[in-house]
A protein has these predicted regions:
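Short helix-coil boundary/hinge micro-motifs
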Residues: 1-81, 86, 157-193
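Short cysteine-rich clusters marking metal-coordination/redox-active sites
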Residues: 97-100, 132-135
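Short helix-to-loop capping/linker segments positioned immediately adjacent to catalytic or ligand/cofactor-binding
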Residues: 86-88, 99-101
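Short metal-coordination and nucleic-acid-contact micro-motifs, chiefly zinc-binding Cys/His arrays
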Residues: 90-95, 124-128
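Histidine-centered nuclease catalytic patch
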Residues: 82, 102-130, 139-155
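A residue-level signal for conserved active-site and pocket-lining positions in enzyme catalytic cores
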Residues: 13, 89, 147
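A generic structural motif
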Residues: 12, 122, 135-136
């Protein structure tokens, strides 16, 4: 079994991102962990001390706050609108085509620009929906009005908590509980969990 990713926070408790267990151990070894949370402990063993013969051990929890990882203005900018990729877009939209309402696997889905790029539309969360290939082909490079099509749901920009949930398919229960505390009541993600 592989070790799950660790949820890294700033000292104020704002989620920063997912890190590997190796990164978490490094933060511990350098004394950069401000505090820890979560119910899951992971113990890692290193080499043996020449002086004492004892084996080194570092324990980390599933959620750690890292010194110097303060979000501040930079973090606010990063999480204002996170980068879009197809996998996260499809997960945000729950694999549901915005036009026909059918659920598909990733290989049958496409990214559709509600307002076409050729007409000045942006590649941003609020201008993107998940569409099956036939519906995207039918809409083509036209506006909804010109294509005589309607959206079944409204796109939205995920907040940092939603974004981190969308990024990781193997979230531990304590990590999910922490992240769900920052997910808005109206979010589609709440309907899944």
């Amino acid at each position: 079994m592989s070790t799950p990713r660790i949820l890294a926070l700033d000292r104020g408790g704002n989620p920063w991102g997912w890190i590997t267990w190796e990164d978490a151990v490094t933060y511990h070894a350098k004394g950069l962990v401000a505090w820890e949370a979560g119910e899951s402990d992971f113990e890692f063993h290193g080499g043996h001390s020449r002086m004492t013969g004892e084996r080194s051990t570092i324990t980390t929890q599933s959620i750690i706050a890292v010194k110097g990882m303060d979000l501040g203005k930079l973090g606010a900018k990063i999480f204002k609108e996170p980068t879009v990729d197809n996998e996260l877009l499809f997960r945000r939209d729950r694999q549901l085509c915005a036009y026909c309402g059918n659920i598909y696997g990733d290989d049958k889905l496409t990214r559709d620009h509600i307002f076409p790029v050729s007409m000045g539309g942006k590649d941003k969360w609020m201008n993107l929906v998940t569409a099956c290939r036939p519906c995207n082909h039918r809409k083509a490079d036209r506006t909804l009005a010109n294509a005589r099509m309607e959206l079944l749901y409204v796109p939205y920009v995920p907040n940092r908590y939603e974004y981190l949930i969308l990024q990781n398919r193997k979230i531990l229960a304590d990590q999910m509980e922490f992240l769900m505390s920052g997910v808005p009541e109206h979010s589609r993600i709440r309907k899944e969990h």
